[in-house]
C-alpha cells in the first residue's frame, strides 16, 4: 500500500497527471481521491470518476464499497490505491503535484474566531508598501497581482490551496497571507503548506456545532502552530 502510494507521489512530481477530489471534473488519466466529507463520502462517487476516465482511485481500505469497487475498476482498466486517510493522501498528492514544499514564497497564516479578514488586509497593505508582491487567500477573495476571484470558502481545499500557491509564485509573488479557518485545519486543507509564520487573533464562542466545545475548538486552532510544517 505504501509503495503504491509512493509511486503516485513520484508520478505527480514528474508532472503530466492531475489530481481530483470532485468526480464531476475528472478527466482521462486523472487520479481521483475519494475523500470522506461531512455530508457525503467521496467513495460514493468512485463509479462516476471511473466512468469519466480516472486512471487511479485512492480510497480507504476495507470499506463497504470494496467488492463493487474492485469489479467496476478492473472492468474499466483503472486501479485502486488504498490509503488509511484519504484527506492526508489528497494534500500529499497536491503538494507533490504543485511542488509547494520547495516554495521560496513566505507564507503567513492567520487564524482566530474574528479579525482574520481585517488582519490579512492590513498585512497585505504593509507588505505591499514595503515593496513586496503579495497574494491573499481569504474570505473576501483569492487575489494576487493580475488575478482576483471570489472566495467560496475562507480557506479552499488542498488542491486549490497548493495550485494557487504555485500560480502565485509563478506570478512573482514573494509573500502570501492566508486566512486559516478551524474547519480547514480540522479537514487538513492547509497541511503541507510551508508556513513561515502564523498569527492568532482571538477565540470566542463560535462553530461549536462543529467542534462540540471550546476546548476542542482551541486545540484545533492550536494545530496551526503545533503541527503544520514551517519554512526555514
Language-model features: where?
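N-terminal leader/targeting and accessory segments in enzymes
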Residues: 1-92
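Phosphate-binding loop of NTP-binding sites
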Residues: 88-232
Amino acid at each position: 500500500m505504501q509503495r503504491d502510494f509512493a509511486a503516485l507521489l513520484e508520478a505527480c512530481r514528474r508532472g503530466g497527471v492531475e489530481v481530483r477530489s470532485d468526480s464531476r471534473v475528472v478527466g482521462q488519466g486523472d487520479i481521483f481521491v475519494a475523500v470522506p466529507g461531512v455530508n457525503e463520502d467521496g467513495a460514493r462517487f468512485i463509479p462516476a470518476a471511473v466512468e469519466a476516465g480516472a486512471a487511479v482511485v485512492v480510497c480507504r481500505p476495507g470499506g463497504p464499497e470494496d467488492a463493487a469497487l474492485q469489479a467496476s475498476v478492473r472492468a474499466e482498466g483503472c486501479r485502486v490505491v488504498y490509503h488509511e486517510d484519504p484527506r492526508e493522501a489528497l494534500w500529499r498528492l497536491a503538494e507533490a503535484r504543485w511542488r509547494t514544499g520547495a516554495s521560496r514564497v513566505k507564507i503567513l497564516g492567520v487564524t482566530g474566531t474574528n479579525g482574520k479578514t481585517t488582519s490579512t488586509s492590513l498585512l497585505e497593505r504593509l507588505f505591499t508598501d514595503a515593496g513586496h508582491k503579495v497574494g491573499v487567500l481569504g474570505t473576501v477573495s483569492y487575489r494576487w497581482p493580475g488575478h482576483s476571484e471570489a472566495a467560496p470558502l475562507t480557506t479552499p481545499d488542498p488542491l486549490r490551496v497548493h495550485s494557487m500557491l504555485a500560480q502565485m509564485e509563478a506570478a512573482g509573488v514573494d509573500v502570501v497571507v492566508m486566512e486559516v479557518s478551524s474547519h480547514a485545519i480540522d479537514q487538513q486543507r492547509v497541511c503541507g503548506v510551508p508556513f513561515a509564520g502564523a498569527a492568532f487573533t482571538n477565540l470566542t464562542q463560535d462553530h461549536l456545532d462543529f467542534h462540540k466545545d471550546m476546548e476542542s475548538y482551541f486545540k484545533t486552532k492550536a494545530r496551526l502552530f503545533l503541527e503544520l510544517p514551517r519554512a526555514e
